[in-house]
C-alpha cells in the first residue's frame, strides 16, 4: 500500500483547484440505475474512486451491464434485462453505501438478498431505519448468516417518520417508493444536496418525487422508470477540504465549481474564525492570514448543519488557530480517532465523550501516522502541511475511497508532497 510523504512547515497554497463529482452522490445514483427497465442511464462527472469501482461491481453483479469510461468520467448502465435478487457479498462487504441497492432491487424484483454492509468503521452505524421504513411499505425482512433477506409481493405507499434524518435510509426509501403502489411520505427526511441530486435523477427517469431538500419528501409511485443522462453534483466535502487546506496554510485558493449554498455551514465557521471567503463566478475563493485565525466552537449536525464529513479536516484547521477550540460530534460516535494520530505530531487535545478540545497555535512536528478512516486521512495530510519536518501518512486505502488525485492537486497548489510505494510490511 502506498504512503504519502509531506515536507511540512512552508506550504502556503496558492492557485486554483477543480472539484470532482460527489462521491456521496454518485453511489446512490448508481444504485438508482437498477430501477430503469427501459433504456440506458448515463451518469456524467463521475469521480474515479475505489468506492465507485466497487459500486459498479455491485450493480454489474445484479445482471446490469456497466461501462465506466474513466477518461470521460462517464458511466453507462443498461439494467433492461432481468435483475437478480442477490447483491454479491464479495463487493457489498467492502462498502457500507452498497446497502442502498436494497430498495431498488425490491422495487424491480420484489425480493432481495443483500449482505450486511462494510466500509468505514465509524461507530455502530445501524441500518434499522432502512429496514423499518421498508417494513412500513409491506416488506417482510429477516436477517440470517450475515444477509438481509427482504420480500414483498408488491410495495405499497406508506407514511414514514424517521427517528433520525439518515441519508442512506432516505435514499433507500425514496428509490423503493418510486415503483410502489400509491403515495409514500417520508418525514424527518435527510436534506443533504446529495438527496436533492438523487431526486433530480429519479424524476428525470420518470419518477414523481417532491420535496427533496426539505424535511418532508413525497413520492407517488409509477409503473416503470426509464434511462436518462444525468450530471453528478459537485463534491461539497472535497470542496470543503480544499477550503480548509487554503485556510490553514495562509493560502489564497480558488476552488472551482464549488457551490456556495452547499457549503454554507462550513463557510460560516471559516468566516467566524477570521478566514476570508468570497463567492466568485467560477467557484469559491479562500484567503487566509494565519495570525488572524481565532479559536471557534463547532457542532456537527445533519444538513443544513455543519457536516460530520468535515469534522476531521476542521479539527486540523483548529490546530493552527490560537486558543482553545471545541468540536462536538453528534452524528457518529467514535469519530475522533484521527486526534490520537495527531497527538503523535504534538497536538494538545482532550476528548470527553462527544467533545474534543483542541489547543491551537502550538508547534507541531512531522511524524509517521496511520489514517483511520476516509476523512481522517485527509485531515492527517493537511496537518502534515503545517507541521515542521516530514510527515508520512499510511493506510491510503481510506483516502482513495473518497479523493481523486488528492496529493497531485495539493502539489499543484504548492505543497511539498508526494505519493510513494511502500512494502506491505511497512504498513
Curated annotation (Swiss-Prot):
What subcellular locations does the record give? Cytoplasm
What does the entry list as the binding residues for UDP-N-acetyl-alpha-D-glucosamine? Answer: 96, 125-129, 309, 331
Entry-annotated residues carrying 2-(S-cysteinyl)pyruvic acid O-phosphothioketal = 120
Name one process (GO BP) from the record: regulation of cell shape
Q: Which domain of life is it from?
A: Bacteria
On whether Nucleotidyltransferase is a keyword of this UniProt record, the answer is: no
Q: Could you tell me which InterPro entries the record lists for this protein?
A: Enolpyruvate_Tfrase_dom, Enolpyruvate_Tfrase_sf, MurA_subfamily, RNA3'P_cycl/enolpyr_Trfase_a/b, UDP_GlcNAc_COvinyl_MurA
| CDD domains the record matches | UdpNAET
| UniProt keywords, alphabetically | Cell cycle, Cell division, Cell shape, Cell wall biogenesis/degradation, Cytoplasm, Peptidoglycan synthesis, Pyruvate, Transferase
PANTHER family in alphabetical order: UDP-N-ACETYLGLUCOSAMINE 1-CARBOXYVINYLTRANSFERASE
NCBIfam families with a match to the protein in the record: murA (TIGR01072), PRK09369.1 (NF006873)
| Described purpose of this protein according to its UniProt entry | Cell wall formation. Adds enolpyruvyl to UDP-N-acetylglucosamine.
Name of the molecule in the record: UDP-N-acetylglucosamine 1-carboxyvinyltransferase 1
Amino acid at each position: 500500500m502506498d504512503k504519502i510523504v509531506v515536507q511540512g512547515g512552508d506550504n502556503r497554497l496558492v492557485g486554483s483547484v477543480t472539484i470532482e463529482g460527489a462521491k456521496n452522490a454518485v453511489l446512490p445514483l448508481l444504485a438508482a440505475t437498477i430501477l430503469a427497465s427501459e433504456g440506458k442511464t448515463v451518469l456524467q462527472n463521475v469521480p474515479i474512486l475505489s468506492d465507485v469501482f466497487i459500486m459498479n461491481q455491485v450493480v454489474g453483479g445484479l445482471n446490469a451491464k456497466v461501462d465506466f469510461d474513466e477518461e470521460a468520467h462517464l458511466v453507462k448502465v443498461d439494467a433492461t434485462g432481468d435483475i437478480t435478487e442477490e447483491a454479491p457479498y464479495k463487493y457489498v462487504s467492502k462498502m457500507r453505501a452498497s446497502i442502498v441497492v436494497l430498495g431498488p432491487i425490491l422495487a424491480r424484483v420484489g425480493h432481495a438478498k443483500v449482505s450486511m454492509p462494510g466500509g468505514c468503521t465509524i461507530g455502530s452505524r445501524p441500518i434499522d431505519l432502512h429496514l423499518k421504513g421498508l417494513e412500513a411499505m409491506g416488506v417482510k425482512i429477516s436477517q440470517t448468516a450475515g444477509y438481509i433477506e427482504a420480500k414483498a409481493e408488491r410495495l405499497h405507499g406508506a407514511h414514514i417518520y424517521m427517528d433520525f434524518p439518515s441519508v442512506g435510509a432516505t435514499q433507500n426509501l425514496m428509490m423503493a417508493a418510486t415503483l410502489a403502489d400509491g403515495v409514500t411520505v417520508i418525514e424527518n427526511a435527510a436534506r443533504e444536496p446529495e438527496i436533492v441530486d438523487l431526486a433530480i435523477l429519479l424524476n428525470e427517469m420518470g419518477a414523481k418525487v417532491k420535496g427533496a431538500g426539505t424535511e418532508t419528501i413525497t413520492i407517488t409511485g409509477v409503473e416503470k422508470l426509464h434511462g436518462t443522462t444525468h450530471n453528478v453534483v459537485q463534491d461539497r466535502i472535497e470542496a470543503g477540504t480544499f477550503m480548509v487546506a487554503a485556510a490553514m496554510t495562509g493560502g489564497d485558493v480558488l476552488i472551482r465549481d464549488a457551490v456556495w449554498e452547499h457549503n454554507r455551514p462550513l463557510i460560516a465557521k471559516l468566516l467566524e474564525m477570521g478566514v476570508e471567503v468570497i463567492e466568485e463566478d467560477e467557484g469559491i475563493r479562500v484567503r487566509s492570514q494565519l495570525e488572524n485565525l481565532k479559536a471557534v466552537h463547532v457542532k456537527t449536525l445533519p444538513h443544513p448543519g455543519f457536516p460530520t464529513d468535515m469534522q476531521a479536516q476542521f479539527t486540523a484547521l483548529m490546530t493552527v488557530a490560537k486558543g482553545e477550540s471545541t468540536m462536538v460530534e453528534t452524528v457518529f460516535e467514535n469519530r475522533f480517532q484521527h486526534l490520537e494520530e495527531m497527538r503523535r505530531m504534538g497536538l494538545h487535545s482532550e476528548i470527553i465523550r462527544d467533545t474534543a478540545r483542541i489547543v491551537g497555535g502550538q508547534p507541531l512536528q512531522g511524524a509517521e501516522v496511520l489514517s483511520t478512516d476516509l476523512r481522517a486521512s485527509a485531515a492527517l495530510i493537511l496537518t502534515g502541511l503545517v507541521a515542521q519536518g516530514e510527515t508520512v501518512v499510511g493506510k491510503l486505502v481510506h483516502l482513495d475511497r473518497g479523493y481523486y488525485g488528492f496529493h497531485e492537486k495539493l502539489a499543484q497548489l504548492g505543497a511539498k508532497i508526494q505519493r510513494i510505494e511502500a512494502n506491505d510490511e511497512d504498513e
